[in-house]
Amino acid sequence: MAVKEKKEENKVFISEADQYLFAQGTHYDIYKKLGAHPSVENGKEGMFFGVWAPNAASVHVIGSFNGWDESASPMEKLGPGGIHAVFIPGVSTGEMYKFLITTPSGEKLYKADPFANYAEMRPGTASRTADITSFKWTDEVWMKEREGKDHNKEPLAIYECHIGSWMRHPRPEEQGFYNYREFADRIVEYLKEMKYTHIELMGIAEYPYDGSWGYQVTGYYAPTSRYGEPQDFMYLVNKLHKNKIGVILDWVPAHFATDAHGLGRFDGECIFEDPDPRKGEHPDWGTKIFNYGKTEVKNFLIANALFWIKEYHIDGIRVDAVASMLYLDYGKQDGQWVANKYGGNKNLEAIEFFKHLNSVVLGTYPGFLTIAEESTAWPKVTGKVEDDGLGFSFKWNMGWMHDFCEYMKLDPYFRKDNHYAMTFAMSYNDSENYILPLSHDEVVHLKCSMVNKMPGYQVDKYANLRCGYTYMFGHAGKKLLFMGQDFAQEREWSEERELDWFLLGEDLNKGMHEYVKELLKLYRKYPCLYEIDNSWDGFEWLNCDDKDRSTYSFLRKASNGKNNLLFVINMTPIKWENYKLGVPARKKYKLLLSSTEERFGGCGAEIPKEIQAKKGTCDYRNYHITLDLPPYAAAVFVF
């Protein structure tokens, strides 16, 4: 495809100032200089190529436009910083290319472009030239409104999704994949119907191995070609925005793939990773670790985050494997890691990288989200950088997720002995801004799907899960559900097949789908469920100590004191008659939602539609309500 729009002539495409800023680690638009860019030189249209390869003896561009001739297109080394560049006339978009890097010893390396905007469909490994500047965005209203959002006081209900296995294409020639545009037309209606606020997309940056789910990246600046071209991905984001749905990307700065065409030993030396394998390799994952102390590497990563924001209008990044970056000994045995200059196990360069990243990104783009998947008790992950925090917007509450799953899979007989696993998270809830995640990691590798973690017969499993989801949506913290879990997918997730959509024809699954939809509607309708998430001002236990009956009851409170909600949940198969519960006010408590309704797959046991509180001490309060609490029942009242 020919370059359609006329390009301005650019005699000095990469200036000395560009080279200086990149060497300093602060050229946040470096992706506009390195890589492949349509340009004009001496009146001729073509493509400008730039690459950082400081140790190379020579670099050539080889591609479909020059017959992969290894001598046809030599690049010029511009200065001591190691950037090589060349303008090649007549090259249009859609062409395949690689950099042929020759080392001082004569070794030849055939590398994909680290800044490529498009890649050859796997198993091919070439980069492709692309035009990412001519797409006509129509999401101005969304982008303007985003600037004014304080997400701590807004509902955040995230649908974690893997495009390739959400729904498979029936035509064999498509390799099972829907195009980004086809996916957009399907997913938007689903998300709107269910009332999710955001979608979190796995595996968008280009990667070679399907089984890595996108967590072993080779092309940080290229949306994967499995689902189409760059402008197809822009269409997806634009359509989601037009329908008031935010887009979060899984972002993987923790490590990268070792494939020969990737970043490893890029110019014959370790320029992206540390040359010491104790610092530059992940033994458990078989991947390379970025060298966060190197200015050009930090620049590559921070500019990458900004690239997705500016060029693709992304609304947030979920940073994968943060703990593996913070600790030098993460996943390593004695002798496999090197201590920092103080003799400790903290990765000082990675800490500084996160502070730099969040300061630049959140300081430049108000309303953007940076989310840390951090699995330890590292302090101040969402603390302000000026207070020595890492500066993230939110942190996944992995502790809550672990405790929740461990408790819910217990036989009810043993739950009383583990009662406080479900209440523990509130003891540290105000330490960070949390998201409660039930992610893909919990439904793979023989962990079972969410519904099959539950004990009992099939109807018991579904009743348990409805109770669990009610607890999750009532608990302080933003929400994340992995695809399929909102209709109780029964098989574990696999990237090789689509979700079992046929289950929506089954009463229990259809009921679960409707129930999660009601929870999402409730969550978005009532400010008490989201506007005060990290303070006791928004949450109050009514009874967190009823371990003998395995019940939990609590309030969610709004800042204006209106339309507060009361949650009561019975985690046993026993009906508790004349269940008395202390309440804060002598009011009428009106039922909003009951998990036992038949339309949700429940047993049909009725919970009173309205209960008048009476005077009388209970749970250290002056008023109480009384009801019969059915087995495996969750109820939500408004007052």
Protein language model annotation of sequence segments:
Residues L508-L529:
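Catalytic cores of secreted or luminal carbohydrate-active enzymes
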Residues T93-Y97, P608-F639:
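C-terminal beta-strand-rich structural cap/linker in extracellular carbohydrate-active enzymes
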Residues W52-V59, P584-R586:
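Short proline/glycine-enriched turn/loop motifs at strand-loop junctions of beta-rich domains
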